[in-house]
Amino acid sequence: MANPSKAKGTDWEMRVLRFLASYGLDVQRMPPAGSLDVGDLQLTDKDGDRWVIECKATKAIDLAGGMNELRVEQQRAGAPFGALIIKRRNHDTSRGYVVIDLGDFAATVSDEVL
């Protein structure tokens, strides 16, 4: 791969995929689709809900930018949930950061259906 940044991003996506799969989650890597992108990964959780996963392995963390990108990809994919997974420098994959909207968090930990 000629682009070092792309190689780092792809490596992080694969590490996240393998980590999530090790927990028995049904997770797939999505092919790059440019302006029609539907996230880096998609998974189906134990309740059968689909999640769009956007993975970032950058020096500077841009939460707003990453969440905006995730929201567009989530809507495009028609998935009810989304998560931004950010590489934590100098740490194991399991120590990466996961960012989700408060509404998605409440929906996943509550028995209430809104």
Locate predicted features.
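Catalytic phosphate/metal-binding cores of nucleic-acid and nucleotide-processing enzymes, i.e., regions
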Residues: 1-114
